[in-house]
Amino acid sequence: MRAFSLIIRLGTRHLPWLGGLYQAQRLSRSRSLCQAQGFSRLALSLALLSLVALNLVALPAQAEIRVVDDHGEALTLAAPAKRIVALAPHLVEDAFAAGAGAQLVGVIAGSDYPAAARELPRVGSYRGIALEAVVSAQPDLVLAWGSGTPDDLVRQLQALGIPVYRSEPRRLADIAGNLRDIGLLSGHPAAGERAAARFERALLESRQQLTPAPRVFYQLGQAPLTTLAGGQIVTRVIQHCGGEPLFADAPVLVPEIGWEALLLARPQVIVAAAKDDAWQAFWAGHEALPAVASGTLYSLDPDAVSRPGPRLAQAARQMCADLADAAARLASSSPSEGQGQ
């Protein structure tokens, strides 16, 4: 009898139509017609059990979620992640854009966009990330930055059975891929797809070709003077906007540039990630450089251009507008420079 009641309770909870059968079975006990037909409690219980089993077998199993991260590693989740730790500001932005902001339980210092990210618990900073802080957040998914998250930390998390997705976008298209992947992993594939499509559409609208392509120096540091070499997302943005990024073939990612090399490169445009134009005072008195002589120095939103996330489309739009302006000014001020000589 207990087994029969348990079957009915389980059945009516998960399969509503069993409730009706159960009521019918109860009524049958008081009717002689059922007795005449020879239905016993055991027979009905077995029938109900068979129906439950058949329906449970028929229920579709939830499909595994499988993606390949930017390091070429396959990541498989049995179910969408519910507790996510993001170890880079751009990954926090990705998560919010892909609909997973509410599932973030830990982020890295400097994660300030959108505004809701400022209220999330910190598990570390660019100076270091404590394994204990990440683990204590009880994540079922960690979003790591390929070149920014220590490899040792990634291996330790994986050894503990915590899935790690590593983001390392080197091309603009990789950012859209990250948005789609995070949407899938967090159970928001539609939101991830929408975010990726918005990003791709914005890039398509801003893309331009300039003939000749202006020579662009991206100033990263001032003392010493440094830039970013090829393979960095900023150089991709410059190319996307029709410019020629100088020193893109340097053998290191952050090359130090001497004055002689810069004079030989003759940059026609200088851009830097800065909140204002104060950095441009550094170039006063260097009119031997075409960019300084023509005044084609531009400031870019530092967060938008340095974080390979959804707001990079905004930085690309700004960069493209600046390079188009520079090309027009160069063409009108100096025919030789306008021709890229």
Language-model-derived ranges and their functions:
Residues D70-G72, V123-E132, G148, A250-W259:
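Short helix-initiation/N-cap motifs at beta->coil->alpha
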Residues L131-Q138, L160, E256-R266:
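Short helices/loops that flank or line small-molecule/ion binding pockets
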